[in-house]
């Protein structure tokens, strides 16, 4: 349809629409001329140059738009919960994945499971809160993927629940280094590899706590708010390199990380009461959102934070019972 319309315009140009020559591969170009009306001054004309869509961008098939075949991915913290679901989602869509975890035994078990499932997944031991280990991880990834990386999923995160005034310096440092400093540094390290891929995608795992107030989570929510703003800033800064930056912000998801707090039935009922869908989320419901943001089908989406929260973050006062 786009090609037909362009052909029609080229052969039957309406008034104020002109084609101009160009040495660019994106040609012909459209030159839209229009007049600014100013009652106090003589009218003047301006031009807007609109690059004509390339044949290759139109020719991509539907199957390719929803596939990660030929792409490489790094997922941090990929042996449990949301991280494991992300690894399996990306690998299932055809990506070659490298993941990391602190627990070597746990990592080896996961790698065995993935190998039996036919997934192309490798892994290495890494504590991403440690700067030198992050550097070693990215050296490994660069070697495995020959200097290119299409997808970076910064999944690792932790939480300490307590009133802000009770935080020790060590606890504050732990949350900041694990939740924010690690993702910031990994992005710095991954940038040359993402740029080399010509179509990079970074996805941060944020949280609804970056949008709304949650009890005893002032420090954790600060790290997630920082991630949300980093998402927006990097999306603009790295757009010139065709690297997209997005984030996914979950609410309570059924993982081992929240088992203890949700073992309190009264607390669980309160969680349900502020969640319009009235249930907890599943790791797969987060991983599918992450995968979408990595697919060619989402190639015009950047700088966005996608809430996977059953409607919690937009719920004002909408009681489940009248």
Swiss-Prot record:
**InterPro entries recorded:** NAD(P)-bd_dom_sf, SDR_fam, TR
Q: Name one GO molecular function term.
A: oxidoreductase activity
> Which family does the entry's similarity section mention?
Belongs to the short-chain dehydrogenases/reductases (SDR) family. SDR65C subfamily.
The name under which this protein is listed is Tropinone reductase homolog At2g29260, chloroplastic
Q: Which Pfam families match?
A: adh_short_C2
Q: Which GO terms describe its cellular component?
A: chloroplast
Q: Which organism is it from?
A: Arabidopsis thaliana
Q: Where is the transit peptide?
A: 1-61
Q: What is its EC number?
A: 1.1.1.-
- Localization: Plastid, Chloroplast
- Grouped into one coarse class, the protein's main location is plastid
Task: Work out whether the entry's keyword set contains Ion transport.
Answer: no
- Keywords assigned by UniProt, alphabetized: Chloroplast, NADP, Oxidoreductase, Plastid, Transit peptide
SUPFAM superfamilies linked: NAD(P)-binding Rossmann-fold domains (SSF51735)
* Residues at which NADP(+) binds: 74-98
The main enzyme category here is oxidoreductase
Question: Binding residues for substrate, per the UniProt record?
Answer: 207
Q: Which residues form the signal peptide?
A: none
């Amino acid at each position: 349809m786009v090609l037909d319309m362009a052909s029609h315009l080229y052969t039957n140009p309406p008034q104020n629409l002109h084609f101009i020559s160009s040495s660019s591969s994106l040609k012909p170009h459209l030159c839209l001329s229009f007049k600014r009306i100013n009652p106090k001054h003589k009218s003047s004309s301006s031009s807007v140059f609109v690059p004509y869509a390339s044949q290759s961008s139109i020719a991509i098939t539907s199957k390719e738009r929803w596939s990660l075949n030929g792409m490489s991915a790094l997922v941090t913290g990929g042996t449990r919960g949301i991280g494991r679901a992300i690894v399996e989602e990306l690998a299932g869509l055809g990506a070659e994945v490298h993941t990391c975890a602190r627990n070597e035994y746990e990592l080896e078990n996961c790698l065995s499971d993935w190998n039996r499932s036919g997934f192309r997944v490798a892994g290495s031991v890494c504590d991403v809160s440690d700067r030198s280990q992050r550097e070693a991880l990215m050296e490994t990834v660069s070697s495995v993927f020959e200097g290119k990386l299409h997808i970076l999923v910064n999944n690792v995160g932790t939480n300490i629940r307590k009133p802000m005034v009770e935080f020790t310096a060590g606890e504050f440092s732990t949350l900041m280094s694990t939740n924010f400093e690690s993702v910031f540094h990994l992005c710095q390290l991954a940038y040359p590899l993402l740029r080399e891929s010509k179509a990079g995608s970074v996805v941060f795992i944020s949280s609804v706590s970056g949008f709304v107030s949650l009890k005893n989570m002032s420090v954790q929510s600060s790290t997630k708010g920082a991630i949300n703003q980093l998402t927006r800033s990097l999306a603009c800064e790295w757009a010139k390199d065709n690297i997209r930056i997005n984030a996914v912000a979950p609410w309570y998801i059924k993982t081992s990380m929240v088992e203890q707090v949700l073992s309190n039935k009264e607390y669980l009922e309160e969680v349900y009461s502020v969640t319009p869908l009235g249930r907890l989320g599943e790791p797969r419901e987060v991983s599918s959102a992450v995968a979408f943001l990595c697919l060619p089908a989402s190639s015009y989406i950047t700088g966005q934070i996608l809430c996977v929260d059953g409607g919690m973050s937009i719920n004002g006062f909408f009681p489940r019972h009248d």
